[in-house]
Amino acid sequence: MREWFTRAAVAVALMPTPAFADELKIDDLVVANTIPAPQRDATVNAAKGFYQFWNIGDEALLKAAISPDFTDHTLPSGRPQGPDGPAFASKTFRAAVPDLSVEVRKMIVAGDYVTVHMVFRGRFTGTFGKARGEGQAIDFIATDLLKVTNGRITDNWHIEDNLTLLTQMGVAKVEQ
């Protein structure tokens, strides 16, 4: 069974995708073999576009990847709901970490759902609230669960390692 998933993952990785999605590096892509090819391709491309948006900040990628009915089920305080939320989050975070990049370590596609484990990296050279960056290295993990319908992301549940992020920024201190 695992061998079949591996072959399917290789096939998906080799299929043609939009140019923006080709730029995104995914370390490990696993796709369930029960997904019809058109749905599989649309789902993988939506997810790739979404994470390429996070990788480079181009809002055209975001608009192509998410539905107008997008819902963030783990909406942080102060972030707008809907399609404007990820754009707001990206702008806010890029003000603190202008060279922000994302590496997708694992993407698992099963039916309408995509689970993604990623690493965000960059240097804190901007501002975050009252904190001013001094070039600190930023390197923290996050995991998303996306629902994709008709090739567009409709729902997102996400969790980020904010303690590591805030500690790296010097905003939080962990006493041992």
Where are these regions (language model features)?
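Bacterial N-terminal signal peptides that target proteins for export
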Residues: 1-8
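Cleavable N-terminal signal peptides
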Residues: 8-9, 19
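C-terminal segment of classical bacterial N-terminal signal peptides
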Residues: 14-21
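Short, low-complexity N-terminal intrinsically disordered segments enriched in polar/charged residues
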Residues: 21-64, 68, 174-176
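A solvent-exposed, acidic/Ser-Thr-rich amphipathic alpha-helical stretch
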Residues: 42-45, 59-111
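Short beta-strand segments enriched in hydrophobic/aromatic residues
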Residues: 66, 108, 120-122, 160
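Exposed beta-sheet edge and beta->alpha loop/turn motif
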Residues: 119-150
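Short beta-strand edge/turn micro-motifs at domain boundaries
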Residues: 139-167
